[in-house]
């Protein structure tokens, strides 16, 4: 099976242009970050991009409006990465309805406890918007079983610990953990931690069904030319499916 390539971008004024470029250069699913004032799960690069977007006046309304008008330019599925506070403030039902109407495939909600995600699934599954499960590598096995048994779309494995050694290879324990999750999962299991280079991709693709690249993509959209970004995306894509 081909491996999933899931790049992350911050929802900003270049949202549609950046997402279109990614979708034309190998992205299978694009994660669109919704800027938030207190992004507890974000690293420094994404946090800074979020602050910039807030300064530009970017809101969830702006993102929905752009997706409504121009989402058809994005040639692959896209998910929103948002904190629960934004959904709560918008109104849960209205939010899910708007996601459905703007073609959003799913939601990644990093601060959402498993129990609350279950309630949202029960209440709003008829909108067809998937709630993507996050599994931290520190989560105990029983909890993982519970999360995985209700997973939809794909499972996003994350970790807060240092994940790459001196040689840039991923810790064997992480790989074992991904394999144990895959053994009980009915959806793809993707890795989303510290992946920056084709070398990282080559290492982690042995076990994962796909990869998420966040900070590195955000960094490149900030400082690279369009041509350089395309070249980077091609190198990731080739490594992933070679």
UniProtKB/Swiss-Prot annotation:
Gene for this chain: trpA
Domain of life the protein comes from: Bacteria
CDD domains for the chain: Tryptophan_synthase_alpha (cd04724)
HAMAP family per UniProt: Trp_synth_alpha
EC number: 4.2.1.20
Keywords (A to Z) from UniProt: Amino-acid biosynthesis, Aromatic amino acid biosynthesis, Lyase, Tryptophan biosynthesis
Organism field: Staphylococcus aureus (strain MRSA252)
Reaction equations catalysed: (1S,2R)-1-C-(indol-3-yl)glycerol 3-phosphate + L-serine = D-glyceraldehyde 3-phosphate + L-tryptophan + H2O
One GO molecular-function entry: tryptophan synthase activity
Function: The alpha subunit is responsible for the aldol cleavage of indoleglycerol phosphate to indole and glyceraldehyde 3-phosphate.
Family: Belongs to the TrpA family.
Active site: 31 (proton acceptor), 42 (proton acceptor)
This protein's name: Tryptophan synthase alpha chain
Uppermost EC category: lyase
Pfam families: Trp_syntA
Subunit structure: Tetramer of two alpha and two beta chains.
Pathway terms, separated by semicolons: Amino-acid biosynthesis; L-tryptophan biosynthesis; L-tryptophan from chorismate: step 5/5
Entry's Gene Ontology cellular component terms: cytosol
